[in-house]
């Protein structure tokens, strides 16, 4: 489904932490996918970094309330450079003090290292507009809920 829409990559967080060279240095959007058949296990303390000394962790009840059972997409993001922004997301998830608090719920998933990231270049469109449209389409398909780790439209 996502491949038909121009997304490429589909690399695990674990593999991208080991080799970010596959990430393109172009503007675009990216999605984070949890392709597991089992229910998610939420961690009280995740692996996210404490950017500006702010605790990235939230209550498990908050994570449960935001979980979208009917979707494999758990986050939609935008980037002026996919390599840089996805790199920041990965570094934040690896506990670094990096400015990527968006998506922080991802790192309270017990299987966060198995999440997959796919990306799509948007050479003729503004990444923010594409992201906004994708989130709106997601909300329409999922009863008004955003992807699990998207905290704003």
Where are the regions that the model predicts?
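Positively charged, low-complexity intrinsically disordered regions
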Residues: 35, 39, 102-105, 143, ...
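Aromatic- and Lys/Arg-enriched surface recognition patch
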Residues: 87-115
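Mid-sequence acidic-hydrophobic segments that form the walls
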Residues: 89-92, 137, 141
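Generic, ordered loop/turn and secondary-structure boundary motif
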Residues: 64, 68, 87, 107-110, ...
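Alpha-helical oligomerization segments
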Residues: 139-153
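GIY-YIG nuclease catalytic motif and its immediate N-terminal context
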Residues: 1-84, 117-135, 151-153
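General helical secondary-structure elements
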Residues: 81, 97-100, 142
């Amino acid at each position: 489904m996502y491949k038909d829409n121009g997304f490429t990559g589909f690399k695990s967080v674990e593999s991208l932490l080991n080799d970010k060279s596959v990430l393109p240095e172009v503007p675009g959007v990216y999605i984070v996918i949890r392709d597991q058949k089992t229910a998610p296990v939420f961690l009280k303390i995740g692996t996210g970094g404490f950017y500006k000394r702010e605790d990235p962790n939230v209550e498990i009840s908050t994570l449960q309330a935001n979980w979208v059972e009917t979707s494999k997409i758990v986050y939609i993001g935008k980037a002026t450079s996919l390599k840089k922004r996805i790199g920041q997301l990965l570094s934040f998830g690896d506990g670094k003090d990096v400015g990527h608090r968006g998506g922080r719920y991802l790192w309270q998933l017990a299987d966060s290292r198995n999440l997959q990231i796919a990306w799509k270049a948007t050479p003729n469109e503004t990444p923010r507009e594409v992201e906004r449209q994708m989130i709106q389409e997601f909300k329409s398909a999922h009863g008004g809920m955003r992807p699990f780790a998207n905290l704003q439209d």
